[in-house]
């Protein structure tokens, strides 16, 4: 029987949209802590919040976006949120106090969270159900590329041209995403009777999905660990007199993750979740241990490879598990629930770790992150691995 077609025009445009949106996130996430220190003399915790306040906004918006996405319209919401992203990127240049910077970050995060939920949900209706893991993995390569290009430019642009050039780059990527919103065609999701009846019922069951929360809880834990590298690795590398290793970490992360995503999705579809998930947890663990015990140029680059194989592969695999667990009418809510907890980990991670780092040092902080990866693996075993993860999961989507 002929395999369902995956590489359509809209799937490719969706990858471009995802890349542009993710670039905005990673461009600013890795540089805002340093900007807050340089511009406003912020302390470690405040600098961490300058970075993660964006994620706070994203978490807030995801709570409601999953429920109301199909009422608003997926493409319409993408257009609105990307327009806001353009304005917010320009507004950073005019923020003259830390409070204003934080306010813009939160608003920008709200727009990103809503737009990201829209594209992550919509692309699942473009991917054939029989190729769910494979398609989600390929789609995630855009995020992978942005994890290398975004942090790299986030370090290079301020050093070469100062921070306004960084904000201009963010505005440009938002503009690219805005244009792509008019090119992509997304299938319209018909509202179920339950969705219509419960439109104004803001009960917990209508805002979040249990399957999305279960799998998202794992990403909450490991997301905190990845936030350490995202926000504090540049300073950690500089303290160890290998400042240039930080940008190379993200390049190594992206290359390793990109290679892994070319085949882990197909392996997940064919051989089951556990066959893929447990090895990527181990890779992630090794990467964090390397950061803790070998903070040299080769050690940090090698850590980037292992974290790329680990965390970089884990995210699309977990998303595929979440969306396979619900009917089509619940995909938006399940997707928003999944990313809500992933964002929460990225948001609270810099705040918690920023407070802990002065006590433990960078080495101790990354060893703590290794412990979080182990905890995430244990949680996975209890919420999914021991029940359904050992074989290809049954799918509601069709």
Label every PLM stretch briefly.
Residues 1-7, 186-217, 398:
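Juxtamembrane intracellular "pre-TM" segments in multi-pass secondary transporters
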Residues 41, 73, 94-100, 272, ...:
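Helix-breaking motifs and short loop linkers at transmembrane-helix boundaries and internal kinks
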Residues 60-93:
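Conserved MFS/SLC helix-loop-helix module at the cytosolic interface between two early adjacent transmembrane helices
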Residues 172-192, 379-384:
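C-terminal membrane-cytosol helix-exit motif in multi-pass small-molecule transporters
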Residues 55-63, 147-148, 254-258, 262, ...:
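Residue-level signature of mid-helix packing/kink "hotspots" within the transmembrane helices
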Residues 106-143:
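Cytoplasmic helix-loop-helix junction between adjacent transmembrane helices
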Residues 61-73, 261-272, 357:
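Helix-to-loop junctions at the C-terminal end of transmembrane segments
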Residues 99-107, 287, 298-306:
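Paired small-residue
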